[in-house]
């Protein structure tokens, strides 16, 4: 097979998409490269759907090979193991924009695999993998309603930048990933430093315009190397069976979807389903999934019709009303900060814990090791939706929701120089009926304020929905779980009163327009301000005092050439301080020393020990020292730990001294005065000049 390539200029760099050389037995395979970053992306679909398959089984796996960064994996086995959080999140980034673009009747097992085989620090392999997923599907025989492309948008010095470098991202006040087709935006995810809704919208559509050349390049590649698409049979509908199901269940479902309580509503729909199956299965044996499909279609139709035509939702709210909110803080006595945030039937128990630099997370990536001092972990136990399941590690959804909430809050976390703590937020979802990640954002801000973290401003989050039927459009504030399931969009926005800190959009239709997104952003702002008002009533500002169970961190500075004196040979000195006081000590290369302890007395003792280790003698100053060694010509007196000076025999007394031992012996405490320091740093001390003097307090 001949190799085909297309090149496209993108953000001042050249992206190359090639096919026909690697992985030729896959349904579709491309190699996407930019600079020294190279990603292989393959797409494979089974020849037919499994028997009884009633959903689309798409899986996306993104993996960064250690050799791509010139590294050997750590650990005993020395090979790549379970996916990192970054790999999991990137897999989700790739999945979300392509999932709605497969034909509804295509239910074959489909797998996208993106493998990073070379990586530099300037070209994001995740973005190349997203482009590659679309391109691999385009050149394959798999039916796909693409192409799409992705871009990361930053803003440096007020100017939007495509796929910013690491250096540019450090200066950027905005970082948003946009996936789009020719006509519409399909997925958005990112964060910003309290950006206005207008700026966020501009960034999104800057990204939409930027990806158009890549979309065209994929079309060109398909013309060069694509194969004919598979025929997908339209789903056949048994109209007679559909009519029977409608006659039996439609009226009951119409009443059921207006029941406000989630469990009661689901129970009633479950009863209607059971009754319908009991009536029809004797006649239509083996067609249970088909009957359930019709029931689901009727529920979908009735919920959407009620919203579009009547302007009212499942629980009776109009499109802009937020569910009732209740908030408690400080419920957990031993947690450093805690909050219980309840919005309707969604409830999050959120706790914040303060730690030291020892508690920072160390992350090993292709580009080396980094450290992370702000962590947020989101847990979604099965009981929160009245279910049971076997739980081990957090799933992709939990990792994704946690990262979204973390991104929303990290922009208001104080800098390390101002608040030298590691901060961990844990959100346990106790009940869920929509928008649990946004409840986590609200609860996380409240828990940090309760812990005394001086955050820049409170942050609230809200999930928006969309119902689009023909020309009829309804944008919903604070959506329920069923509205998420039956709607066309899940659009989450978090931020402060000043602006947006995080955004995420997923859609089930082929795209949303600028007008819809603008209206959703402005409606989300109104909802966010309402929620912030409720949060302000619970706790208006961060507490001025930390929890008595939180470590107190005191910062002192020493000269950089004194760091080795604090540490000591083999860590002897610092180990001695921690053992004697029970404190935790972190020393930075700059000479900054953070001392953490729940006891002020222990902290003060540790500071004194460090000051003693790093103190320097000053000429003319008095010191209380200890005689360490007696010689014929004088005595060596230690004035600080590890620092001593010589009291010459002539400086022992105003009278002539014949033997040093007549005045001083080893172990004696003696008040001395520093009378000089020579060029070699040797200290000259005098007992004679200190006679009659009193050591200052």
UniProtKB/Swiss-Prot annotation:
Keyword vocabulary terms for this entry: Cytoplasm, Magnesium, Metal-binding, Nucleotidyltransferase, RNA-binding, Transferase
Family assignment from sequence similarity: Belongs to the polyribonucleotide nucleotidyltransferase family.
Presence of the UniProt keyword Transferase in the record: yes
Subcellular location(s) per record: Cytoplasm
Function statement: Involved in mRNA degradation. Catalyzes the phosphorolysis of single-stranded polyribonucleotides processively in the 3'- to 5'-direction.
Designated gene of the protein: pnp
Reactions mediated catalytically: RNA(n+1) + phosphate = RNA(n) + a ribonucleoside 5'-diphosphate
SUPFAM superfamilies, A to Z: Eukaryotic type KH-domain (KH-domain type I), Nucleic acid-binding proteins, Polynucleotide phosphorylase/guanosine pentaphosphate synthase (PNPase/GPSI), domain 3, Ribonuclease PH domain 2-like, Ribosomal protein S5 domain 2-like
Major localization class: cytoplasm
Keyword Membrane attached: no
Organism expressing this protein natively: Geobacter sulfurreducens (strain ATCC 51573 / DSM 12127 / PCA)
Protein name: Polyribonucleotide nucleotidyltransferase
InterPro entries, per database record: ExoRNase_PH_dom1, ExoRNase_PH_dom2, ExoRNase_PH_dom2_sf, KH_dom, KH_dom_type_1, KH_dom_type_1_sf, NA-bd_OB-fold, PNPase
A Pfam short name: RNase_PH
BP terms from Gene Ontology: mRNA catabolic process; RNA catabolic process; RNA processing
Gene3D superfamilies cross-referenced by the UniProt entry: GHMP Kinase, N-terminal domain, K Homology domain, type 1, Nucleic acid-binding proteins
Cofactor: Mg(2+)
